[in-house]
Each structure stands twice: as C-alpha cells, then as structure tokens.
C-alpha cells in the first residue's frame, strides 16, 4: 500500500520465486534480511525517500540490478547487498555515513565506486571479492581502511591519494593483482598484516614516513616493487614476512624499532642494516637467506635472536651484537661464513648448531654467562682458534666443537660433570686440555682425532668413559687415567 513506510525484517526471506517488486515512494526502511535469499528477484527500485537498508536485506539477490542508491539513505547494514551480481556501479551519497561490514561483499559485477560521504573509516570487507572493480574514488576525510575492504579486487589499479590516512587494516588490498598506486601515505601510522600481500605491481617507497609505527606480518609479502626502509623515526615493529620480497638494499635511521618478526627481512636485496639502538627482538629466520647482507649495525638491547635468524648470510662480516645479553636460537648464524669474531660474554643461551659452519670464525671472546649450550653449536668452525671462558655448565654438549680443526685454546669450567659425545672430535690443533676435577663422565669419541694433544690427564673424579674417547691422539706422550676407572 502507498502508506507503507517500512518492510519488516525477514518479511520475504528465502522467497526464491519472487520476481520484480514495486515498493511505494513513501517507504523509509527495508528491514534486516527482508529480501535475503530471493534469488530470482530481478528488480527492486529503491524509493527516493528511503533512509535505511538493513543488514542482509538483499543478500544473494543475484539478479538485483537497481543501480541508484537514493540521496536520502543514511544507513546500509552489514552484508546488505552481498552477492548482488548485477550491480555495476555504486555511489555512496553524502548523507550515507553508516555503511556496514561487507555491505557489497562479492558483488563481482561492480566496476566503479564513488564514495561521496565524508567518512573517516571504510568498513571491513565492504567490497571484498568485488573482483572487477576498476575505479574507486574515496573521500579525502578517510583516515582508516578496514580489514579486507578491497580484498581480491583483482582489476583495481589506483585508489587515489590519502593524505590523512593513518591505518590500513589487515588484508585491505590483498590479492589486488593490478594495483599499482596508492598515492601519498604521509600520515600513515599502521599498515596491517597482509595489507598488500601478493600485489606484485604495487609501486611504493616507505622511506621517510614520519609517523609509521607498525608494519604488520606479510604486509608487503610478494611485493617486489616496494622499496625503502630508511628515515622512519616512529617505526617500532616489522611483522613476520612483512618485507620478504621487497627491494630494500639498506635499513637506516630506525631509532625506535624494537621488534623484527619471523622472516621479517628475509630479503636477498638487503646489503646494510644500520644501528638499531632500541631493537630487542629478532624473530626466527628474520634475515634468513639475506645473502647480500654485509653489515648489521650496533643493537645493544637485543635479548632474543630466533632460530635461523641469520642463516646463510654468507657475506655478513660486521655484526653489532657484541656483549648483548641475549638468547640465541638454534641455527641462528649457521653458515655465516664471513664472521670472524664474536663477543658472547653476556649471552645466556645458545641453541643447537647456532654457529655451525661459520668457516672464518676465529675468536669467541667469552661464554662466561652461558647457562644453556646446544649440541653442535660451533661444529665445523674450522678457523676457530680461541674460545674464552665457558660459563657454569654441568654438561658440554655432543659435538659442540666437532671439526674445529684450528681450536687451540679452550677452558672448561669447574662445574663440568659430563663431556659429551664427540665434543672435541677432530680438533686437530688442540695442544692441551685441562679436564676439571668435577668431571665424572667422558662420553665416546669426546677427543677422538685430536692429533696435537701431547698430554692427557684424566682426573680421579671420572668414573665412566665411552669408547674411543682418545682414539687417534697419536701425539700423546703422557697419559694418566684414574686408578679406579670402571
């Protein structure tokens, strides 16, 4: 009837055979899910005085093709037009200040969006999976783009300039295959996780963004044309895999950076990392396979270096981590074949194979604070000559110095009780070793192949020795074993 001002919630929901509907011009509101699931609804022109379209109101009305949203609209509820496949253009009028999450979700016929309402936030998922959108015009008032707002808009190339933009939500522009330009981001503070993941054509420099605090995990994963990580005075966090494919030869002037997530800068283009005075956390694989990296500046506050953090950084010569009170994860520096000297005096924990295959490493200044040392920690550091004081360990791990062929100077602590299997195997250059009176067990092959050992004195405290402990020690001229060894 002409006097009708509202259509109640769910009134025609799932009326699958419903075809064109004519509504009176005086209609002010279409309730939640009013026509949801009316899959054959072909036409439903919105009246000129309409103020509200409820949540899911036209959900899955696949053939619904009324393009014009009246200027009187002030609210569109969440998922109101989801999967309305025949929509080709959307204009958000100046009065339409309340648009719900996913309002046009998967409307893959839309090609053009003109958002005139002066909103500050673009809702989550509002145009998610609108694959064929080519043009988007957003108001200059926007300061935040919600999560997944333009996710998988595969034909989108340009979204204009956002001089006031402070936050881009997670996956906001993820899988936008043709996106090239996102304009000015001078006010940006946070770029959410996966915000631009797989946007291979995106051209963007991050240099000089004065307010940027957070780059979320995978934010620019798979974005080879993203460049620059210099002069970012507010940056505090780089998330996991955030810049793994970007073109970033230098990291410099990041005075507040505290955290680099897993694989955050695992980047083959990276050559130099400047001083990071606030850095505390280096995540697993953070610089893994950064095969061009030569210099890592001073980072005196680091407390954690994750597993594989610098794995295969074969050109890394300068490492500004001397004296840090850190925990070092397994394989953290494995195969860093250009490192020559390390001061680990304040390190408390070193994981398995942390420095294995560091072939040019000559000196470890000290291990005096160590409370946990993993097996194979320095295996095949073939140039290692000197290991400073080792902390109060009770067990020297298996193969910890195996194949350290140049090792000539190492001092075991008087807390040592067990020398592990093959701990010094094939340390050909080791001329002497003092086994503390605290040692009770020497496991098999512990000193096997130490061909330079001249004197072997096993203290009376040792009650158990494995097979071939001193096998191949052919230079030994004096050997003393305990009287009661079993």
Walk through the language-model features, giving the residues of each.
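Structural signature of tandem-repeat unit edges
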Residues: 1-6, 16-29, 39-52, 62-75, ...
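Consensus positions within tandem repeat domains that build extended binding/scaffold surfaces
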Residues: 8-13, 31-34, 54-57, 77-80, ...
């Amino acid at each position: 009837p002409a006097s009708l001002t509202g259509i109640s919630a769910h009134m025609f929901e799932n009326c699958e055979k419903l075809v064109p509907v004519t509504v009176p011009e005086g209609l002010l509101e279409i309730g939640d899910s009013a026509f949801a699931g009316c899959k054959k609804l072909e036409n439903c022109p919105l009246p000129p005085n309409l103020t509200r379209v409820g949540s899911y109101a036209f959900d899955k009305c696949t053939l619904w093709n009324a393009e014009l949203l009246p200027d009187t609209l002030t609210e569109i509820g969440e998922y109101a037009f989801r999967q309305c496949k025949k929509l080709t253009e959307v204009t958000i009028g100046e009065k339409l200040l309340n648009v719900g999450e996913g309002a046009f979700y998967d409307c893959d016929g839309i090609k053009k969006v003109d958002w005139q309402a002066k909103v500050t936030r673009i809702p989550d998922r509002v145009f998610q999976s609108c694959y064929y959108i080519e043009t988007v015009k957003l108001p200059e008032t926007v300061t935040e783009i919600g999560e997944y707002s333009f996710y998988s808009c595969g034909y989108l190339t340009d979204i204009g300039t956002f001089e006031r933009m402070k936050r881009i939500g997670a996956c906001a522009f993820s899988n936008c295959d043709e996106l090239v330009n996102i304009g000015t981001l001078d006010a940006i503070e946070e770029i959410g996780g996966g915000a631009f993941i797989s946007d291979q054509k995106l051209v963007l420099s991050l240099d000089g963004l004065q307010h940027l605090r957070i780059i979320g995990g995978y934010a620019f994963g798979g974005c080879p044309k993203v460049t620059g990580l210099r002069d970012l005075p507010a940056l505090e966090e780089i998330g996991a895999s955030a810049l793994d494919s970007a073109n970033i030869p230098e990291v410099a002037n990041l005075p507040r950076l505290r955290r680099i997530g897993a694989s955050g800068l695992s980047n083959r283009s990276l050559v130099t990392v400047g001083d990071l005075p606030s850095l505390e956390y280096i995540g697993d694989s953070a610089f893994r396979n950064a095969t061009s990296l030569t210099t890592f500046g001073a980072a005196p506050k680091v407390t954690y270096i994750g597993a594989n953090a610098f794995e295969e950084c074969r050109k890394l010569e300068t490492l500004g981590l001397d004296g840090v009170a850190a925990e070092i994860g397994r394989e953290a520096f494995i195969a860093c074949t250009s490192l020559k000297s390390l001061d680990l005096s304040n390190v408390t924990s070193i994981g398995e194979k942390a420095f294995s295959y560091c072939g040019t490493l000559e000196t470890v200044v000290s291990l005096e604070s160590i409370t946990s040392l993993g097996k194979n920690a320095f295996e095949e550091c073939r140039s290692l000559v000197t290991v400073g004081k080792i902390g109060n360990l009770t067990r020297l791990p298996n193969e910890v110095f195996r194949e350290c062929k140049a090792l000539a100077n190492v001092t075991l602590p008087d807390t040592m009780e067990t020398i592990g299997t093959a701990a010094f195997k094939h340390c050909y250059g080791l001329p002497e070793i003092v086994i503390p009176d605290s040692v009770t067990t020497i496991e098999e092959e512990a000193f096997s192949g130490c061909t330079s050992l001249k004197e072997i004195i096993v203290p009376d405290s040792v009650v158990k020795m494995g097979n071939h402990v001193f096998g191949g020690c052919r230079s030994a001229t004096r050997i003393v074993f305990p009287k009661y060894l079993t």
